[in-house]
C-alpha cells in the first residue's frame, strides 16, 4: 500500500527505485530490506526499511517498479528473504541447485559444489 501511495501521490511522486538491499540482523527480528526511492520530478528521496523474522514474507513491489524484479531476486538469492506475489522469484546469481543463501550470518560455505572445491577464503585465488 505504501509503495502505490508514494508513486501516485502528487506531493511525493517517487518514480525511481534507486536501490533495494537486504540485510541480516542475526537476532529475533532476523532480516531487513531497505528501499531507496527518488522523485525525478520533485528532486527528493526517501528510504524505507522493513524488518521481519526469519519465516515472514515481504510483499513484492515488482508490479509497481519493474526494476524491483531483479533487486528482489538478488535479495532472495543471497539472503533467502521471500517476496510474496513476485512474478518469478528464483535465483539470479547462484545456480538453481545451490544450497543456502551466502550472505546470511549463519551460512556455512560447502566444501564442494558438483564435485568442485568451493574456496572458503581469498587465499584460494591469491
Where are these regions (language model features)?
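Terminal low-complexity/charged segments
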Residues: 1-126
Amino acid at each position: 500500500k505504501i509503495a502505490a501511495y508514494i508513486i501516485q501521490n502528487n506531493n511525493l511522486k517517487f518514480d525511481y527505485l534507486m536501490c533495494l538491499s537486504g540485510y541480516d540482523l542475526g537476532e529475533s527480528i532476523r532480516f531487513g530490506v531497505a528501499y531507496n526511492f527518488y522523485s525525478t520530478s520533485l528532486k527528493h528521496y526517501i528510504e524505507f526499511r522493513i524488518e521481519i523474522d526469519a519465516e515472514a514474507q515481504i510483499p513484492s513491489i515488482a508490479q509497481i517498479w519493474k526494476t524491483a524484479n531483479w533487486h528482489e531476486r538478488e535479495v532472495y538469492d543471497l539472503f533467502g528473504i521471500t517476496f510474496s506475489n513476485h512474478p518469478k522469484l528464483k535465483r539470479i546469481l547462484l545456480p538453481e541447485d545451490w544450497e543456502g543463501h551466502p550472505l546470511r550470518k549463519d551460512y556455512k560455505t560447502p566444501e564442494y559444489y558438483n564435485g568442485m572445491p568451493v574456496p572458503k577464503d581469498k587465499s584460494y585465488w591469491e
